[in-house]
């Protein structure tokens, strides 16, 4: 793999990184650098605690500009969002209470370009957006 990559690492960006990097990347850990963005402070702490040396975990939301945003912390962490839940739609499904907002926090959002520049990243090979 080193020969194929010419001794460079793949750069993987995970936007909305709750749960961490997808397990299918686990066999290639030594060949990639992961940049994980997770705005939920609860999930960020878990990611930071369990991250490998090849991962940079950033507690930030991404947006089209640098600005303050509202973030809705939901009962189930993985469904927290900058958008309030639409219960007119969600109540049509089982388990809609997982979207109950427990708290609204204010946090700074920034652009992907700005965040990558701060980390010295010029190029990205893969990006997963789950927001």
Give the residues covered by each predicted segment.
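Phosphate/nucleotide-binding beta-alpha loop and adjacent structural elements of enzyme active sites
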Residues: 1-131
């Amino acid at each position: 793999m080193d020969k194929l990559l010419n001794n460079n690492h793949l750069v993987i960006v995970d936007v909305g990184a709750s749960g961490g990097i997808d397990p299918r990347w686990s066999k290639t850990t030594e060949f990639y650098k992961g940049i994980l963005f997770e705005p939920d402070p609860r999930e960020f702490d878990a990611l930071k605690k369990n991250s490998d040396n090849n991962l940079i975990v950033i507690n930030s939301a991404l947006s089209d500009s640098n600005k303050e945003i509202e973030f809705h912390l939901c009962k189930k962490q993985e469904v927290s969002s900058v958008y309030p839940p639409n219960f007119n739609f969600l109540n049509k499904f089982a388990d809609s209470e997982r979207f109950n907002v427990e708290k609204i926090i204010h946090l700074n959002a920034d652009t992907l370009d700005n965040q990558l520049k701060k980390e010295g990243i010029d190029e990205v090979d893969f990006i997963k957006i789950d927001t």
